Amino acid sequence: MADFEEIINTRRSIREYDAKEVEDEKIEKILKAGMQAPGSRLGAEPWEFLIIKNKETLAKIGEIKPRVTNAPVAILLIANIERSFYKLVWQQEMSAAAENMLLEAVNLGLGGLWNGVAPEEERMNAIGEIVGLPKDENLKPFCIITLGYPAEGWENKFMDKFEESRIHYETY
């Protein structure tokens, strides 16, 4: 297990993966990390997860989100708005879950990429159709996290993004 500061400082978007399969135990840990994210009210978190390993399905989604095509596994995060306590904050709740998942991936020696789906309705509908999501206004595909062992040259590594000029105190 890596040091938390190291995880934060080395997480980056991994777009190329080794062909090695991601172990189910690691996928489960990543899902558990996502479910530990804060929501608008305990027990009212909107997230649901769809694990995709089938190469044909990944290729179909890849026609819309090209980075999904060659990933060993993808997880579609689906918001079930009906479950969210404050209906207007579902995207924040889903974002918290997604980042927890990406951080846990680094902790487990994996790389991940957040592929945005929402809020573009056409893209949300097309991806929902590919995976057989029921046509329900309360079910919203939010993002797709691709996971895998980083390909050579794509390892998680420190990239200094700190810019003091972006920090303000008391007033802008």
Tell where the protein language model's regions lie, with residue ranges.
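Acidic, surface-exposed loops and disordered segments
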Residues: 1-172
